[in-house]
């Protein structure tokens, strides 16, 4: 029966925080390049194996004291001009390769100015290989017999490795060998003589304590960082002679272990030093180098050669690789050849060389900044962010400084005096880098399998030569005594020999008997054990059959449950879809309901607003019609009273004519008396029934007029002679030709018992301004009429028959301005003699910005229907102003009215200003407030023309 393979114990997890307190500083080494000429001036001197001294060469600026400045810098070890590549490798790179084989990461990079020997240190020269070929040689010397077959390990795109079994690896090898031009071949090929001398290393170097129970695989990759872009030097791009494609840059990614790697980078599996260096040399030919003023082959990019060592333990039998991905250990050694920092004033770089130098210096400056921040965070406990992402170089090696691994730096310097300033900056950077500490890498975890399993099934020699057990037993017998017989008479040697042989024979026979006895006992025991095993096997087989039947039944039950589960899942899916449809319908209905509710609320609000508006309009209309009715009733009453008064006066005049005796014809007065005589006309009754307290007196004690005084009824006040007033009104006697001296106006009528009260009404006084005791002679017919109301206020009433004269505004100065004549299309052409004529005017039917921008004045012709049925034309004038926004605004300043009247219309007589008295506290209801307050006297601030007549009546609101 085949023994069951034991399960591999789980790999113990190692916490990263377990060794976080153990840190090692960055190892910085210094290598001094030999001078090109023996008599060349030198600025660097090696003091001992750890210290160099940098002194100012002749011709440079001295310090403040006038002396040359000498500075010493310490390193972990200093390599002079006579140091060989072997010595440098043993001290710097050998520990890194040893850690690589034991599953630890490492970083080695060279730093210095251009032409300081960095590439020579890393690559070497014919006959003297550098660090890179020596590292490869040491790796393959250590794992040469433990390497896995090709394609057992296969890289993926996630910075990890996959394991293939022997069969899959064999198929992969056959597939690659069947290709017309395989990239790698397992057959031995002749080494390229171009680099054959570089990899011929005479000194044999091998790592110690290599795990023999593991298999190893080596993968190499080669990239360069050019102008802060990453390019794969091993990428095979098909050559197109017509349109060659430029190399594509690669991107940086972070794997699950937070390690940075180049996505899509080519990793080649190598099996020997020659094959690995051949891959390196193929990529080295693609690297960008150029001839500068300081170096014939100057590196224009940073190159990174990665050596990835993959190891996996053997299974418990020691025959095949353990097919568990968790047991794979991947370690990486990065060999970096940094481009040299340079100054453009020395290299005289132009064009692309200048751009390359700028990018190189920028990346090196970023590396120095990262070191400064790391040093400050570690020394002072700060937590500043390290700017790794500012450069692809620092971002690629971020996990070495923040994670685990050993970091080594070789500072290459050229001791010639011309490189003094550059070497000074390099030394300062090296001094800062030595103070940066990196976490110590952890040891590789033990897999837990039995050591030495590789040689478990390997034969130790030929099968036919194996010694028997009896021979082994015989070898344990005591040695025979000496058998040399020197004397013929020797009788002791042979008896001793015979006795020893007999003892050995007896002992051998006894041991054979014991062996046979033990063998028979072991056979019996083995037979019993076989019987017991057989019985147990039969018992286990019966149980196994029962278990298999049970398992088959459970499988059937599982299949039934799976079918039921699928049916239920299908029903659940249908229900979920139905629920989704219902929920969607519900959401749509809810949205529609919300929309309808909002619409209903808006309608309700509009309805309430409309109801309130209608209520207000009804109330306003009701109040308006009530006022209008009251006003019309009052006007009708007043009209009737006036008619009664006129009839009463006519009756009185007729009565006076009838009753008066006939007298002689009066003598015609002279002109002088006519001038001094105050001619009065009959005053029409006031449109309102005035209070009986209103009287008019003549100032300075003058006598009343000679006309006979007539009295109204008992309910009215005394008045002047009605006959003279009527005759004067009928004869149209102008009253403004007679001067009138007015001293005062009685605000209240004095009621005295037994004295007849007479209301002396003088002709209406017209004038712009008057004073007490001064004669005022009106000069214009349209001057303001001044009256007194029952409250003692002065009323200024214009003469309605006077010609219209604009008193408020000055004469228009539009003669020199350009006008916009706005005549709407709805206006009608009037046949008046006086027509508005504006020269150089722009006539428009609709006001526009273009016309307003060209003119300074604006005139709008507006027509409306007057109260008498005639068309009234208003010319509304204004000034045009420019606004800040670039437009125009119009400020209206004046209105001119053009109106036609019929000359046959009867002139309405004015009512008398004297009205019957009303009780105290009673208010006048003859008209509304709007009509009473429509006329006022207004004087603007700063005006020198005196008060002016202004009409403030608002137009009646039309019915909606």
UniProtKB/Swiss-Prot annotation:
For bias kind Low complexity, which ranges apply? 682-691
Q: Where is this region: Interaction with ARF6?
A: 794-911
Q: Where is this region: Disordered?
A: 1-20, 659-691, 898-928, 941-960
User: Domain of life of the organism in this record?
Assistant: Eukaryota
Is Cell cycle set as a keyword in this record? Answer: yes
Q: Which disease is it linked to?
A: Anemia, congenital dyserythropoietic, 3A: An autosomal dominant blood disorder characterized by ineffective erythropoiesis, hemolytic anemia, macrocytosis in the peripheral blood, intravascular hemolysis, and giant multinucleated erythroblasts in the bone marrow.
Protein name (Swiss-Prot/TrEMBL): Kinesin-like protein KIF23
């Amino acid at each position: 029966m085949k023994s069951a393979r034991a399960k591999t114990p789980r790999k113990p997890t190692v916490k990263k925080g377990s060794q976080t307190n153990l840190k090692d500083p960055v190892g910085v080494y210094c290598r001094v390049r030999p001078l090109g000429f023996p008599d060349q001036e030198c600025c660097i001197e090696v003091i001992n194996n750890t210290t160099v001294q940098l002194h100012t060469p002749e011709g440079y600026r001295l310090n403040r004291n006038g002396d040359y400045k000498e500075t010493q810098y310490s390193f972990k070890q200093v390599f002079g001009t006579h140091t060989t590549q072997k010595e440098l490798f043993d001290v710097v790179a050998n520990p890194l390769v040893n850690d690589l084989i034991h599953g630890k990461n490492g970083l080695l990079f060279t730093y210095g100015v251009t032409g300081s020997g960095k590439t020579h240190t890393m690559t070497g020269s014919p006959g003297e290989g550098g660090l890179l070929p020596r590292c490869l040689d040491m790796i393959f010397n250590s794992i040469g017999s433990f390497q896995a077959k090709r394609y057992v390990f296969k890289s993926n795109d996630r910075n990890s490795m996959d394991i293939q079994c022997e069969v899959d690896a064999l198929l992969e090898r056959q597939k690659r060998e069947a290709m017309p031009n395989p990239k790698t071949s397992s057959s031995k090929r002749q080494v390229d003589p171009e680099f054959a001398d570089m990899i011929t290393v005479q000194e044999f170097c091998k790592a110690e304590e290599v795990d023999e129970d593991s298999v190893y695989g080596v993968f190499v990759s080669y990239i360069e960082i050019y102008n802060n872009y990453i390019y794969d030097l091993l990428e095979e791009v098909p050559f197109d002679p017509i349109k060659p494609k430029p190399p594509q840059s690669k991107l940086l990614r972070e794997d699950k272990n937070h390690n940075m790697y180049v996505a899509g980078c080519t990793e080649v599996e190598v099996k020997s030093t020659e094959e690995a260096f051949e891959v390196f040399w193929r990529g080295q030919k693609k690297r960008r180098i150029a001839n500068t003023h300081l170096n014939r082959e100057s590196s224009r990019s940073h190159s990174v050669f990665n050596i990835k060592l993959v190891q996996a333990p053997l299974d418990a039998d020691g025959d095949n690789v353990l097919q568990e991905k968790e047991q794979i250990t991947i370690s990486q050694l990065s060999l970096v050849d940094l481009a040299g920092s340079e100054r453009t004033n020395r290299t005289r770089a132009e064009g692309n060389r200048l751009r390359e130098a700028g990018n190189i210096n920028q990346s090196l400056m970023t590396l120095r900044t990262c070191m400064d921040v790391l040093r400050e965070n570690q020394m002072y406990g700060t937590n500043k962010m390290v700017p790794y992402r500012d450069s692809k170089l620092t971002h690629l090696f971020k996990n070495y400084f923040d994670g685990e691994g050993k970091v080594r730096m070789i500072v290459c310097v050229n001791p010639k005096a011309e490189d003094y300033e550059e070497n000074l900056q390099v030394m300062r950077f090296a001094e800062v880098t030595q103070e940066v500490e990196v976490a110590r890498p952890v040891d590789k975890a033990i897999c837990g399998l039995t050591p030495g399993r590789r040689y478990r099934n390997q034969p130790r020699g030929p099968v036919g030569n194996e010694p028997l057990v009896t021979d082994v037993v015989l070898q344990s017998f005591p040695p025979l005594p000496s058998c040399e017989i020197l004397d013929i008479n020797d009788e002791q040697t042979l008896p001793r020999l015979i006795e020893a042989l007999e003892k050995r024979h007896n002992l051998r026979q006894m041991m054979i008997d014991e062996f046979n006895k033990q063998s028979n006992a072991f056979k019996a025991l083995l037979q019993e054990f076989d019987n017991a095993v057989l019985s147990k096997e039969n018992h286990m087989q019966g149980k196994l059959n029962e278990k298999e039947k049970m398992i088959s039944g459970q499988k059937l039950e599982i299949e039934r449950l799976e079918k039921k589960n699928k049916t239920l899942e299908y029903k659940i899916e249908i229900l979920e879809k139905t629920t989704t449809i219902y929920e969607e319908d519900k959401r749509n209905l809810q949205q529609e309901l919300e929309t309808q509710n909002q619409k209903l609320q808006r309608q309700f609000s509009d309805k309430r607003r409309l109801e309130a508006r209608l209520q207000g309009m009804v109330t306003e209309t009701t109040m308006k019609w009530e006022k209008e009715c009251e006003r019309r009733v009052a006007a009708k009453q007043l009209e009737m009273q006036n008619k009664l008064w006129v009839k009463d006066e006519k009756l009185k005049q007729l009565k006076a004519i009838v009753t008066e005796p006939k007298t002689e014809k009066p003598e015609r007065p002279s002109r002088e008396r006519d001038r001094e005589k105050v001619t009065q006309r009959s005053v029409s009754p006031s449109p309102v029934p005035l209070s009986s307290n209103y009287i008019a007196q003549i100032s300075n004690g003058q006598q009343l007029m000679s006309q006979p005084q007539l009295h109204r009824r008992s309910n009215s006040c005394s008045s002047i002679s009605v006959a003279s007033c009527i005759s004067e009104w009928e004869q149209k006697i102008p009253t403004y030709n007679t001067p009138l001296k007015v001293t005062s106006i009685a605000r209240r009528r004095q009621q005295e018992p037994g004295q007849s009260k007479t209301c002396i009404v003088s002709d209406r006084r017209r004038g712009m301004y008057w004073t007490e005791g001064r004669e005022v002679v009106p000069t214009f017919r349209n001057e303001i009429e001044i009256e007194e109301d029952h409250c003692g206020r002065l009323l200024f009433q214009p003469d309605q028959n006077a010609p219209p004269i604009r008193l408020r505004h000055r004469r228009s100065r539009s003669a020199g301005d350009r006008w916009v004549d706005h005549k709407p299309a709805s206006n009608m052409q009037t046949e008046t003699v006086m027509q508005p004529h504006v020269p150089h005017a722009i006539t428009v039917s609709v006001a526009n910005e273009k016309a307003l921008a060209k003119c300074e004045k604006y005139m709008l012709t507006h027509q409306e229907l007057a109260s008498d049925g005639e068309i009234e034309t208003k010319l509304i004038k204004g000034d045009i102003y420019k606004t800040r926004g670039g437009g125009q605004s119009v400020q209206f300043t004046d209105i001119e009215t053009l109106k036609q009247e019929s000359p046959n219309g009867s002139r309405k007589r004015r009512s008398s200003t004297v009205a019957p008295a009303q009780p105290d506290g009673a208010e006048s209801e003859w008209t509304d407030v709007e009509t009473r307050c429509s006329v006022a006297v207004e004087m603007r601030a700063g005006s020198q023309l005196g008060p002016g007549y202004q009409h403030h009546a608002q137009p009646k609101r039309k019915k909606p």
